[in-house]
Amino acid sequence: MKLVIASVISLLSFSALAAPEGTLSVHILNQQTGLPSPGVQIELDKQQGRAGSISPPVKRMPMGGLNRSIRRRRIVEPGVYKVTFKTGDYFKSQNMNTFFPVVPVIFNVTKQNQKLHIPLLLSQYGYSTYRGS
């Protein structure tokens, strides 16, 4: 029994020493209601080269509110990225018009395996974003 416990502890310790994985998490808060905005689709793209072209999306996923993480090895590399929040369908589902049907946020990853958080505070006619923690 002691051998089994020691083996499990050693495996847990080994996994803690494994290479860290960078993450990007986002959340979308509707400032008019004070509630998360479920169903907003996001895309993550990495900029390639100096011409400013954007590679095909790395990840697409519907948003269910707070702290949805996008985890892919390609996002942990330093570079310029763009996360696009497709807000038009969300507002349409709420029977509301919006001036910003798409909100692109371009940001710079400066270190390998960084943990990043990008909040989006959203209303029909405006938005705000910042580097979260």
Label for each model-derived stretch:
Residues L3-P38, K46, S128-T129, S133:
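Beta-strand-rich domain onsets/edges
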Residues A19, P78-S133:
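Feature of secretome-associated and extracellular-like proteins
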Residues L29-T33, R71-R72, Y90:
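Short beta-turn/strand-loop junction motif enriched in small, turn-promoting residues
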Residues Q41-D45, K82-T84:
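Beta-strand signatures of extracellular beta-sandwich domains
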Residues G49-S69:
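Short, acidic Ser/Thr/Gly-rich low-complexity loop/linker segments typical of extracellular
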Residues N67-V80:
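Short Pro-Gly-centered beta-turn/loop motif in secreted/extracellular proteins
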